[in-house]
């Protein structure tokens, strides 16, 4: 089954996107 409900998954995805953007800018 899903490890997270939709709300938690969306929150984590948004955090990951933010980290990815910061990493890209840092590079």
Swiss-Prot record:
Modifications the protein undergoes after translation, according to the UniProt entry: N-glycosylated.
Domain Jacalin-type lectin intervals: 1-27
Domain of life assignment: Eukaryota
Keyword Iron-sulfur: no
Gene Ontology terms, MF aspect: carbohydrate binding; IgA binding
Keyword annotations of the record: Glycoprotein, IgA-binding protein, Lectin
Protein's job: D-galactose-specific lectin, binds the T-antigen structure Gal-beta1,3-GalNAc (Thomsen-Friedenreich-antigen-specific lectin). Potent and selective stimulant of distinct T- and B-cell functions. Shows a unique ability to specifically recognize IgA-1 from human serum.
Family designation: Belongs to the jacalin lectin family.
Oligomer and partners: Tetramer of four alpha chains associated with two or four beta chains.
Name of this protein: Agglutinin alpha chain
Organism: Artocarpus tonkinensis
């Amino acid at each position: 089954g899903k490890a997270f409900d939709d709300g938690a998954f969306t929150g984590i995805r948004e955090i990951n996107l933010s980290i990815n953007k910061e990493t890209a800018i840092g590079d």
